[in-house]
A protein has these predicted regions:
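Bacterial N-terminal signal peptides
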Residues: 9-17
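Signal-peptide-cleaved, periplasmic/extracellular N-terminal interaction regions immediately downstream
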Residues: 23-43, 51-56, 75-78, 95-97, ...
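Surface-exposed, proline-enriched loop/turn segments that connect beta strands in immunoglobulin-like
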Residues: 60-63, 89, 153-155
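Active-site-proximal beta-strand/loop segments in catalytic clefts of secreted hydrolases
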Residues: 333-334, 435-438, 477-482, 505-510, ...
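Active-site histidine-acidic residue metal-binding/catalytic motifs
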Residues: 414-494, 498-502, 512-515, 520-522
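Active-site-adjacent mobile loop/cap segments within catalytic or ligand-binding domains
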Residues: 505, 512-515, 525-527, 554-618
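Active-site-adjacent substrate-binding region
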Residues: 531-556, 566
Length: 618
């Protein structure tokens, strides 16, 4: 899934924060329960990869790719797997099906992979070219100069008192260097990389300091004739009040507040949420969440206003009602502001943390009572931050939760209890959503023979769906056919809209460029995000490990968008590696896909027995 394909930028791994389970137990030895018996599904053939008529076919890297690395993997196929095959004079092993994968050195400039296949009719030759940028070198020492392309910051900055910022340039080595905002004093720069001549100066905006917006001026050397350069970014500091940013509506229904302009995601405000905006870095706007806590949003995703009143939500009364699935907690607010939900590791409590808010809750009403929620408490955690804690009754635990603004400014937290499970048939009656990753417009990774990940994912999902039907479950597929186009954000949304009880996203792996595919054993990985999904991830991981079909790369926490689905236990499974010839060959075998499906369903059964309400049906 991680392989970078020129035609497919499929954002399956968005980073962020939220209810992260402790990963301390991952990797420790533990007894695995016996796998439940699962009847085999009918074998469904995978659409075979296209067979090239050429003696040698390169699949990766693409022609003309630009790559900054010292080594790169190369894969494709040959017409005769028994013939001697070499790339740049190095013998390359070929799988019996004709696929090959090599890890080879590359050098700067236009680099050519020259492949030779010794056929009985003569030697077949094929070439694949890429460009490797040369390593950075210093400027000549015999002349004072500044590299204008190196001047940083490269994007406009809007700063406030207390903000730290950095000016940087590349210039002749070992010389005095200075920088200034036009009209301001010159400030010395320090040479932080003497080998390349990289200079930096770090600043903090002083209280009441104002300047700009204007580009920085840089100088190398001393005296009036010393070379100078002017940056392209405009930098400013202001004492004006912050703007108000209002989240725009989008396809996902939420925005991603990041830890830095290019950092990981941390909070996900819904459309209409208002925040103070008190800084800017290029196309990113800094928003204030609470005392000492800020994040960054894409400027295009918010409406900015300098005339609106700042967000100050008041938290009113709280109501708790029983629902068929569990309970619903409604928190009255005077306006929409950002919030986050954090569940504890024991899965018996959740905290709704509301930003830009003041608590004024006099009543917590249990309407008709609740056998699921025990108590609701609130406190002013910090100035502008209210924490509402929902604790379940003893012995109860979360199966999932969903938080949203209901209509206007009322915040609704739906809590889901575990479904009833029949010990003899633990999956009977459960809706299991299978998400075959990728689609025709974003096909994912590709194998040496040309097998597309999206097709392998779908074939595994079909095999698992048939097994689930035999177990009495109702399988739901996010992609109903191999040609369906389903966006990434629509996949977890389907789980909510179609009433799924579990969500499993099925993938097969690739590797980022410059990563040695032979550096360690590679095989399956299971990913989870929320604490209430850890048990599902562990059960499926253990079932795959017991089946021992490919090497085990572990159970991992990861901030993947589909795994962040909170309404039900949700995981993502990387079944095998598309780019490894032997694993691509296995994925093209119906019997192997059947074994994967058997392991998956066995893990789901064990999870249902462990986490579900296992009272016997009448």
């Amino acid at each position: 899934m991680n392989q970078r394909l020129a035609a497919a930028a499929y954002a399956a791994a968005l980073l962020g924060s939220g209810a992260a389970a402790s990963a301390a137990s991952i990797g420790k030895s533990r007894l695995r329960p016996p796998l439940p018996r699962v009847e085999a599904a009918p074998i469904v053939p995978l659409h075979p990869p296209r067979v090239s008529s050429e003696p040698i076919t390169f699949v990766w890297p693409p022609e003309g790719m630009v790559l900054s690395a010292e080594e790169e993997f190369v894969f494709g196929s040959v017409a005769d797997p028994d013939a001697h095959f070499a790339i740049n004079g190095q013998t390359v092993a070929v799988h019996k099906d004709g696929g090959f994968l090599a890890w080879l050195p590359i050098s700067a400039g236009t680099f050519t992979f020259r492949a030779e296949l010794a056929l009985s009719s003569g030697t077949a030759v094929a070439e694949r070219r890429l460009f490797v940028p040369p390593p950075p070198v210093p400027l000549p020492d015999d002349k004072l100069a500044i590299d204008p392309a190196s001047l940083s910051p490269k994007a406009d900055l809007e700063l406030r008192a207390g903000d730290w910022w950095t000016a940087r340039m590349k210039a002749t080595r070992g010389k005095p260097a200075r920088v200034r905002v036009p009209g301001g004093p010159w400030r010395d720069m320090r040479e932080v990389n003497p080998r390349l001549g990289i200079y930096e100066a770090v600043f903090q905006v002083a209280p009441r300091e104002e300047f700009g917006p204007a580009p920085l001026q840089y100088q190398i050397g001393s005296g009036g004739s010393a070379p100078r350069a002017t940056g392209t970014a405009r930098v400013s500091a202001t004492v004006m009040p912050p703007s108000v940013a209002t989240a725009k509506a989008n396809a996902a229904g939420f925005l991603n507040v990041k830890t830095a302009p290019s950092g990981g995601f941390m909070v996900f405000p819904p459309a209409g949420a208002r925040m103070l905006a008190d800084g800017r870095d290029g196309d990113s706007v800094r928003v204030e969440l609470g005392p000492g806590l800020s994040g960054w949003l894409d400027a295009k995703d918010v409406e900015l206003s300098t005339s609106s009143l700042p967000p100050r939500a008041e938290i009113g009364n709280v109501g708790v009602t029983e629902t068929p699935a569990g309970a619903s907690v409604r928190i009255s607010l005077s306006e929409r502001v950002p919030f986050e939900v954090v569940e504890n590791d024991a899965q018996d409590a959740a905290v709704v943390r509301i930003f830009s808010a003041t608590g004024h809750t006099n009543i917590v009403a249990f309407e008709g009572g609740s056998d699921f929620v025990d108590q609701v408490r609130w406190r002013q955690e910090a100035t502008g931050v209210v924490a509402v804690t929902v604790r379940l009754k003893p012995g109860r635990r979360l199966w999932g939760w969903n938080a949203r603004y209901d209509g206007g400014a009322s915040l609704r937290l739906d809590l889901r209890r575990p479904p009833r499970v029949n010990r003899r048939r633990p999956l009977e009656g459960l809706k299991v959503m299978l998400d075959p990753g990728h689609m025709p417009s974003a096909p994912g990774a590709v194998g040496p023979l040309g097998t597309k990940e999206m097709d392998a994912n779908y074939a595994i999902a079909e095999a698992a769906a048939e097994l689930l039907r035999r177990e009495g479950a109702l399988p739901l597929l996010t992609r109903g056919t191999t040609t369906d186009e389903v966006s990434l954000v629509d996949r977890p949304r389907q789980a909510v809209d179609r009433g799924a009880d579990m969500f499993i996203s099925l993938h097969n792996n690739g590797l980022p460029d410059g990563t040695n595919p032979f550096s360690k054993p590679r095989g399956f990985t299971v990913f989870y995000y929320h604490p209430h999904s850890l048990a599902l991830g562990r059960a499926v991981h253990d079932a795959y490990a017991k089946a021992a079909l490919v090497p085990d790369e572990g159970l991992q926490w990861d901030n993947l968008l589909v795994a962040r689905l909170s309404a039900v236990p949700s995981i993502l499974v990387e079944n095998a590696y598309m780019i490894l010839p032997e694993q691509e060959a296995l994925l093209n075998e119906p019997a192997f896909r059947e074994k994967l499906a058997v392991a998956l369903v066995a893990g789901l059964k064990n999870f249902a027995l462990e986490a579900g309400d296992t009272e016997k049906k009448p």
